[in-house]
Design a protein with these regions (language model features):
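Accessory nucleic-acid engagement/destabilization modules that flank
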Residues: 1-148
């Protein structure tokens, strides 16, 4: 069963103890805010809409049980590949892959498209990962909270 509220970031006190949920940032607010900021930055070159959607997809993998466990001290989770996969599914192999490079690399930096990299997976390898096998399955609520 999925939680009613998804969170992007937890909050801790000075001793590292988790603070109550009211101090945490909701995932919906985080994705909307990042989308808005990305659109502002992209205005200078006229790509506001695609930048907004890229920003909204960058942490889509946080809509998962595995990431909820991460927020409570569990192991790290690939939360970027899900958004990269959705971008390619929705916008295809040109715009979608440009978005996917940004989304998949938002922590580790841009990956190679398909050639060997510096101990990082390529975008091609990441896009081949399967939901609920290689990366966490997404809760469907993301489609109601994030309007693409």
């Amino acid at each position: 069963m999925s939680p009613l509220i998804y969170y992007a970031h937890s909050a801790q006190d000075k001793l590292g103890n988790l603070l109550p949920y009211k101090h945490w940032q909701t995932l919906q607010s985080h994705l909307v805010n990042v989308g808005e900021m990305a659109a502002e930055f992209a205005q200078v070159f006229g790509a506001q809409e695609i930048a907004c959607q890229t920003g909204q997809l960058h942490d889509l993998g946080k809509y998962s049980e595995a990431f909820d466990r991460r927020l409570h001290g569990g192991s790290s989770v690939d939360h970027a590949t899900a958004g990269a996969k959705i971008a390619v599914e929705r916008w295809g192999n040109v715009i979608g892959k440009l978005m996917a490079f940004c989304i998949a690399g938002h922590h580790a930096g841009l990956a190679n498209g398909c050639g060997e990299g510096d101990n990082r997976s390529t975008l091609k390898q990441r896009l081949a990962l399967q939901f609920d096998e290689d990366i966490p399955a997404l809760y469907n609520l993301w489609q109601q909270e994030i309007k693409l």
